[in-house]
Amino acid sequence: MTQDKPIVETISNAGEQVTNVFGQFWQLVTSKNTTNNGDSKPIKIEQLPIYAEDNAPLKQKFLPEEPLPLQREFATIRIACEQEYDRVAERFKVVDCAMTQTKKAATKCNAYLTEEWTALPKAAAITVGGMAGFVLGLKRGPVGRLLTTTIGLATMAAFCYPIEAVDVAKTGRAHAEQTWYSFQESPTPSAIVKTNLSPPK
């Protein structure tokens, strides 16, 4: 009958085994690191990448847009026209300058005519009103023609310039009232100086 080992010895043997296992594991880990470090080649600082993405560039693929029907033909015609115009404009700069100025003047004239409440349409309307008054007064003699023409011009001017017509009417009324009041008031008679016609004494 064999005698069992004491418990203290058993615990010490287990501790030694665990220590040996950890030592072997540490040797394996350190040996792998040393071999890997030995295989790497040293590089210069200038060769190090600034960003991590430099080592793995992204592959990009651009898909060209398919042209529409007749797009290439129109593009060819447009490019040819532009080239011809540039060539002609370079040789005839005076003609190009004149064409540009004419285009600007035509644009300004069109904008002026199409804009509302400009002087030209108003002048045309006032002229038409005066001509209508003149035609209506043909059978009334010179005074009648002058009167109807003046009435036609004044009527169309009042329609075209309503604010100014109101101001003129107010001013005329004020002057008329002042003239009427002045006419109604009789002037103050001056003191009559009697002349002494008796002979001197």
Curated annotation (Swiss-Prot):
Q: What happens when the gene is disrupted?
A: Abnormal mitochondrial morphology with localized swellings and tubular extensions, and distended cristae. Double knockout with fzo-1 or eat-3 RNAi results in mitochondrial fragmentation. Double knockout with chch-3 results in reduced or no brood, poor growth and withered gonads which on a cellular level contain fewer mitochondria.
Q: What is known about what this protein does?
A: Sustains mitochondrial morphology probably through maintaining cristae morphology. May act as a component of the MICOS complex, a large protein complex of the mitochondria.
| Bilayer topology | Multi-pass membrane protein
Q: Main site of residence? A: mitochondrion
The protein here is known as: MICOS complex subunit MIC27
Quote the subunit structure annotation. Answer: Component of the mitochondrial contact site and cristae organizing system (MICOS) complex.
Which regions face the Cytoplasmic side of the membrane? 32-117, 167-201
Q: Which residues form a coiled coil?
A: none
Indicate where this protein resides in the cell: Mitochondrion outer membrane
Annotated organism of origin: Caenorhabditis elegans
Tell me the lineage of the source organism: Eukaryota, Metazoa, Ecdysozoa, Nematoda, Chromadorea
Q: Which residues lie on this side of the membrane: Mitochondrial intermembrane?
A: 139-145
